[in-house]
């Protein structure tokens, strides 16, 4: 792989047709975009194909809206691929292939801020994990949180 000696990404715009950007840690950190990133993205989007990648449990339309709110003016859902989109598609596929198109019963273990992963999907939210067709995990724990928080809850559950 060739090492690029760039001071600004715009210097290599003519060398590539497609730009893939991870969001967290590349475009944004701690709720703030990095300096100069929005301006550079808008210039690249005007001339090249751009795809944004994220491990966020969010639908593409939510992330595209966030990008526009940050100033990335032409961000659209087809430009975004998230782990949330993958999960959403798997739920839809499972409903068709394994549930005879019946509405899936989903037990979602995750924080309230991740509830948008299920926006615009027909499902039944249930509180009993043993009755679930699908166990959706979108919980996040950083190094300051207890990773064993759910051990007791999950003990003895049918998984």
Regions found by a protein language model. Give the residues of each.
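HAD-like aspartate-dependent phosphatase fold
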Residues: 1-159
């Amino acid at each position: 792989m060739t090492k690029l000696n760039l001071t600004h990404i715009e210097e290599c715009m003519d060398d590539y047709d497609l730009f893939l950007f991870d969001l967290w840690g590349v475009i944004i950190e701690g709720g703030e975009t990095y300096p100069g990133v929005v301006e550079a993205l808008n210039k690249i989007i005007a001339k090249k194909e751009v795809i944004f990648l994220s491990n966020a449990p969010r639908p593409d339309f939510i992330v595209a809206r966030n990008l526009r709110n940050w100033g990335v003016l032409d961000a659209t859902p087809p430009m975004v691929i998230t782990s949330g989109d993958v999960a959403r598609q798997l739920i839809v596929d499972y409903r068709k292939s394994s549930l005879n198109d019946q509405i899936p019963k989903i037990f979602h273990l995750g924080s309230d801020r991740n509830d948008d992963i299920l926006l615009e999907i027909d499902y039944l939210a249930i509180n009993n994990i043993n009755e679930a067709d699908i166990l959706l995990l979108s919980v996040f724990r950083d190094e300051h949180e207890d990773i064993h928080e759910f051990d007791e809850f999950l003990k003895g559950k049918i998984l």
